[in-house]
Amino acid sequence: HPVHMISTAPCFYHKENRLKTFVNEDYYDDLKYVEDNYSVIIGNDVWIGSGAYIKSGIRIGDGAVIGAGAVVTKDVEPYAIVAGVPARLIRYRFSKEQIESLLHIKWWDKDDDWLKENGHYFSDANGFISRFRQLEDSSNRRK
């Protein structure tokens, strides 16, 4: 925002403002494209609670949970649960070994048929991982 101007309202610095404009030329260039180092990267299957704030440049790992109203100022690891102001680690959703397996499985890349066939395993992490290993082993034996 142009904090150096009398008003920060776009009608005073953009000639093509959607609502109304009082100027004939642009006096301030908005950031049209944000550089990658300012982008927030959100992994797969992430849950972000209502009103959470995520600082620019932050990476949220796969399977992470951000509590409602949290202020995230640091990267969040995969399958971490964070909450608070500033956000802090509450706990991990799964054990280190389970997290490694889930990141290897990448279930979010599976097609709908695979998800339908294996959806009932999603309620038990160990059963899910075991099922995937069985499928992987049988697939490797066929090769």
Predicted regions and their residues:
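Glycine-centered loop/turn positions within well-structured domains
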Residues: 70, 74, 78-80, 88
